[in-house]
Structure formats: structure tokens, C-alpha cells
UniProtKB/Swiss-Prot annotation:
It holds the Pfam family PRELI. Keywords: Phosphoprotein. This is PRELI domain containing protein 3B. The gene is PRELID3B. Belongs to the slowmo family. PANTHER family: MSF1/PX19 RELATED. The modification Phosphoserine is found at residues 46, 51. GO terms for cellular component: mitochondrial intermembrane space. Residues 1-172 form the PRELI/MSF1 domain. InterPro entries: PRELI/MSF1_dom (IPR006797), Slowmo/Ups (IPR037365).
């Protein structure tokens, strides 16, 4: 078993970061995620948003893994459960693979919280527990997978920034459109008054 952990601070408020987290896929930084299906989403009586999603991924595999499973690329599935608490301003996301569970399990947990000293920033804490089963090189493979998870975490943070930029652009477009739709009738009214 190999445990990997990481912490990252986003220079964006919690509301923006959690919105981006729910819209992270697909993105150009991690093209291996080829699909996201929402299986269930509901708000509980205390106001927490619960989501259960299925992520479809397609990976090119290292040569040692190819020889073990007999495939060069494989589609895998990950189940993801998240809980967003808007009162406490926390988002916890847990994911686990549901493909190849007889060979490997990857259990990941991400937590998003406002930065304790700066509410305009958000702290992301990540943890992954990797277990390779029934292979003599399991510790080597677990280390290799931890390295891949670390690399993908960096891509994930880049993807979050990409989504946040996209969301900010959409907000600005909506604001500009709203300003324009207000100005047009006002300009027409002013023209009528001048006549």
C-alpha cells in the first residue's frame, strides 16, 4: 500500500473553486477523462449537496502493466461521491476505481475549504491510497502509480484554473450583455426625450 498526499492553495474564493470542481471534466489538460455521468444528485434536509458520478477514463498503460493485463489501452471507470456543505464551506470528494479492482485499488479523497487566514483563497487537500494486489512488484507499481497521481494532480490544478478562467469569462460576457441590454432602452428613451 502506498499513500500519497498533497496540499494546494487556489487564489480564488471557495465558491468559485467548488463550482469549477463540479465542472472540471472534460478539459484539455487531462484528456484521459472521456466522460462524466451524474448518477444521483440531491440536497439533503440540512442543505448539503450530494453527488454520485461515474467517470469514464481511457489510459495508455506502461509496458509492465500491458504485459500483466494484455492490453495497450484500457477504458476504466471511477465512482465519485461528493458532499458540498455551503454553511460550513466544505466540499469533500471521494473516488475509487471500479475497474480492475482485482488488481489495483485507488481510493482518493479531496477536501476544499476556505483558507483560514484569507477567505479569498481556497485550500485543497488531496490523499490517495494505492494498493496493487497479487503482483511480486507491487511496491514498485504502487510507487509508479503514486508518481502518476502526483503528475495528474498538477494537471488537475491546471484544469481547475482553466475552468475558473472560463467561468470568469462567462460571467463577464453576461455582465456585458446585461449592461448592453440596459443601455439600449435607456439610449432610446433619451433620444425620445430630446425630440
Amino acid at each position: 500500500m502506498k499513500i500519497w498526499t498533497s496540499e494546494h492553495v487556489f487564489d480564488h474564493p471557495w465558491e468559485m473553486v467548488t463550482t469549477a470542481a463540479m465542472q472540471k471534466y472534460p478539459n484539455p489538460m487531462n484528456p484521459s477523462v472521456v466522460g462524466v455521468d451524474v448518477l444521483d444528485r440531491h440536497v439533503d434536509p440540512s442543505g448539503k449537496l450530494h453527488s454520485h458520478r461515474l467517470l469514464s477514463t481511457e489510459w495508455g498503460l506502461p509496458s509492465i502493466v500491458k504485459s500483466l493485463i494484455g492490453a495497450a489501452r484500457t477504458k476504466t471507470y471511477v465512482q465519485e461521491h461528493s458532499v458540498v456543505d455551503p454553511v460550513k464551506k466544505t466540499m469533500e470528494l471521494k473516488s475509487t476505481n471500479i475497474s480492475f479492482t482485482n488488481m489495483v485499488s485507488v481510493d482518493e479523497r479531496l477536501t476544499y475549504k476556505p483558507h483560514p487566514q484569507d477567505p479569498e483563497k481556497t485550500v485543497l487537500t488531496q490523499e490517495a491510497i494505492i494498493t496493487v494486489k497479487g503482483v511480486s512488484l507491487s511496491s514498485y507499481l504502487e510507487g509508479l502509480m503514486a508518481s502518476t497521481i502526483s503528475s495528474n494532480a498538477n494537471k488537475g490544478r491546471e484544469a481547475m484554473e482553466w475552468v475558473i478562467h472560463k467561468l470568469n469569462a462567462e460571467i463577464e460576457d453576461l455582465a456585458a450583455s446585461a449592461r448592453g441590454s440596459i443601455r439600449t432602452p435607456m439610449a432610446a428613451a433619451a433620444a425620445l426625450v430630446e425630440k
